[in-house]
Amino acid sequence: MKRLLTILVALLVFSGTAFAQEEGDFYDDGYIYEQNGAGDQYFKADLFANFPLSFGDRLFVGGGFTIGYYRFLNSLIAVGGEISPTYNVSIGVKSLIMVPITLGAVIVPTIDKFEFPMGISLGITTSTFDNNQSYFPSFTAKAYVGGFYRLNESWSVGLSGYFLWTPQFFADAPEKNYHGLFATAGLSMRYHF
């Protein structure tokens, strides 16, 4: 009898575990994950074609690259700077080399894993034409737009384009003043940390 009573009590105690359901450790605190946040940073690298817009047929399509660093102030706005050496060749096979160094701000709206940065930056450019005429510094303004796909937490790749305005002003010969206008289109990648 004692043995039967012990078996019945054991079955009664442990029978509840046969019907128990496991509920995971799910906890919803209402937090929505944001791709970028205040303090996030990224390095960027662009490789692009450089299209001269204000030189007629005297300057051919060239190329260049950009290396930049940006830091987010909040989930939408980042500030930083970049350097963008460019190269074009003229009809007389003379080279125009420009090195703009700019500081600016970028607005980065996101949709799921896609980011669409738009920004403006100001700075200076050193220019050399045919290795014998150097102009330094020149004012530079740059507008930027791009589209990126976030591969993972650290890397994103995409397409980007710039509009670059680099005027040349001469105090002693104002008739030589010139507004250099360039557009770029290229491939980009960013490392986020």
Where do the protein language model's features map onto the residues?
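Sec-dependent N-terminal signal peptides
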Residues: L4-F14
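Positively charged n-region of N-terminal signal peptides that target proteins for export
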Residues: M1-L4, Q21
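Transmembrane beta-barrel outer-membrane domains
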Residues: N36-D40, G56-G62, G92-M98, S134-T140, ...
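Acyl-donor (CoA/ACP) binding surface of acyl/acetyltransferases
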Residues: T166
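Short glycine/proline- and aromatic-enriched beta-strand/turn motifs that initiate or cap beta-hairpins
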Residues: A20-L73, A78, S188-F193
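Gram-negative (and chloroplast) outer-membrane scaffold detector with strong preference
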Residues: F51, G63-K142, Y149-V157, S188-F193
